[in-house]
């Protein structure tokens, strides 16, 4: 059997979404079921079947979902409705839509390797250093009686 020519194939679109918070491992099948339930709840069974959605990639804090062309808005709306996956609270933030997976993979931010700093002393008080995304740094005071939080950026940390 010969493959169909490109003009007769079903056109697909891919949606890139960030998984918040970044869980290390969420199974693609579980994500598919959660998205399917959201689509069915919003648009019904007929529209859910017409979307032809699938989870292509799930990992590293990102999700790539496939759908038929013209229905990417419906998929993005359904992703925004999902609040729980496999008993874990989760949210999907739609970042981009493209016709190829390669273009979406270029948009994924690669995790930045940062040197781990265990403790930092500020004004005679010892703090635990927690480096977050986008150059944010949280300092949590060590001790069990009281916790004092300081919020810095990496530039402030380099000055010390």
UniProtKB/Swiss-Prot annotation:
Q: Report whether tRNA processing shows up as a keyword of the record.
A: yes
What are the GO MF terms of this UniProt record?
ribonuclease P activity
Enzyme Commission designation? 3.1.26.5
**Which superkingdom is the protein from?**
Archaea
* UniProt-listed GO biological process terms: tRNA 5'-leader removal
Among the Pfam families in the record, one is RNase_P_Rpp14
The main place the protein resides is cytoplasm
InterPro entries for this protein: Pop5/Rpp14/Rnp2-like, Rnp2-like_sf
Which Gene Ontology cellular component annotation is one that this UniProt entry carries? ribonuclease P complex
**Keywords, A to Z?**
Cytoplasm, Endonuclease, Hydrolase, Nuclease, tRNA processing
State the reactions this protein catalyses.
Endonucleolytic cleavage of RNA, removing 5'-extranucleotides from tRNA precursor
Coiled-coil blocks: none
What does the UniProt entry say about where the protein is found? Cytoplasm
Describe the protein's quaternary organization and the partners it interacts with.
Answer: Consists of a catalytic RNA component and at least 4-5 protein subunits.
Tell me which HAMAP family the record gives.
Answer: RNase_P_2
For this chain, the family text in UniProt reads: Belongs to the eukaryotic/archaeal RNase P protein component 2 family.
Stated role: Part of ribonuclease P, a protein complex that generates mature tRNA molecules by cleaving their 5'-ends.
* The protein, known as: Ribonuclease P protein component 2
Write the gene name: rnp2
